[in-house]
Amino acid sequence: CAKLMKYSPKSDEDFYLFEIIGVEINLIMDKLVSLQAKEQYSFNLSIPTYLAKKTSFNIDGLVNIESFKDLLQYLSKTRYYKVLKEIDFSVPFDVKEVHMCLQSLYYENIVETIKKHFKGSVQKDLLNILYTSIELKNISKIYRYKQYFHESEDSIRSSLFLQYSRLPKDMMNRLISASGPKEVLSLLSTSKYNFYMDDK
C-alpha cells in the first residue's frame, strides 16, 4: 500500500490515509515505550521520505520530546490526543492497552475512509476484506495465547477487537474459553474459518 500511495493522485490520497495512521501509531508507541524506559536514544525515527511528507503532524518533533506531558501537548491537535489524554502517565502504563486503544482508532479510520470513498458492492467487498483480516488476527491471537501463554479468558478477551467480529457470539466465547489449542482448532473446523487451520 505504501508503494501505491507514493504514486497515487491527490484525489485518492484520503483512501491511503490508513497507511499514514499506521505509521504514526507505530512512531507514537515507540516514543511512549522509550519515555517509559527512560531511554531517549532508543527512539528510532526511520520511515521513507515520501511517507514523512504526508503525515498529519511533524514527526521530526517527536525526537526531542523528553516527557509524557510534552508528548501530549505536542499531539494535542491530532486525532490521537483523544486516546492519549485518557491515560494516566504518572504511573507505569500498560503498553498493550495503549496500543489496543490506538489500534481501535486505526480501524475506525479505515472503516470511515472506505465508507467515504466507495459505495455498493465495492464498499461491501472492501469492508468484508477488512473485517475478515481483523477476525483472523483475533483467531490467531486466541490460538497463540492457548498454545504458548495460557492467559486468562479476561486477558484474552481484552486483547481482541470484537466490535468487528462477525462470528456468532457463542462461537467466539467458546474459542476464548477453550481448554487449549487443540480445542480451538476443533471449533474452527466447524466454522467458516476452517481453512485457517492449514497444516496445524
How would you name each of these model-derived features?
Residues 1-200:
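Extended alpha-helical surfaces
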